Amino acid sequence: MDNELLSVRELEPSEHPMVSAWARAHGCGKFDPRLLPANRFFAVCVDGNPVMVAALHFLVGVGVAMLDHSFSVPGLSLRNARRASAALVDVASDIAAQNNCGVLQMFVPSGIARVAKTLGFQEQDNNLHFMTKQCL
């Protein structure tokens, strides 16, 4: 993948089982597509095959976009993950700006935070945890 051209496209609903398998492989438990934001879910691809995915959604009225539900294909090297992350962040930043969002945020584990800093993100609080609660 080092010298191959990356492309970014919207993820198809038929690909949700693949994302679920990636989430389990990374120890993230069950991936529930019902928790996806309604805006956009992207895949970074090499030769048309997804290697990383993430969801982008907009917080209404505050000019903030959130990038989350990010997973990579199991076994993706750190070098290739950085490359795919950069492509994903570039596209997400452009779409956020087109939708009048001046800030792109994400909640990530420590390892990804280190990569995110190289992509222009700034750490706001090193004690945040991503939490969900079932209500129905």
Model-assigned labels for residue ranges:
Residues M18-D47, V51-S72:
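A conserved beta-strand-loop-helix scaffold within acyl/acetyltransferase catalytic domains
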Residues M1-D32, N127:
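Short amphipathic alpha-helix that is part of the acyltransferase structural core
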Residues E4, P37-A38, N100:
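Residue-level preference for short coil/turn positions at secondary-structure junctions
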Residues M1, V46-N49, V60, A97-Q98, ...:
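Terminal substrate-recognition subdomain of acyl/acetyltransferases
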Residues P50, A54-L56, A81-R83, D90, ...:
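Short, structured secondary-structure boundary patches
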Residues D2-L6, V44-D47, A86-D90, Q105:
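Generic alpha-helical hydrophobic packing signal
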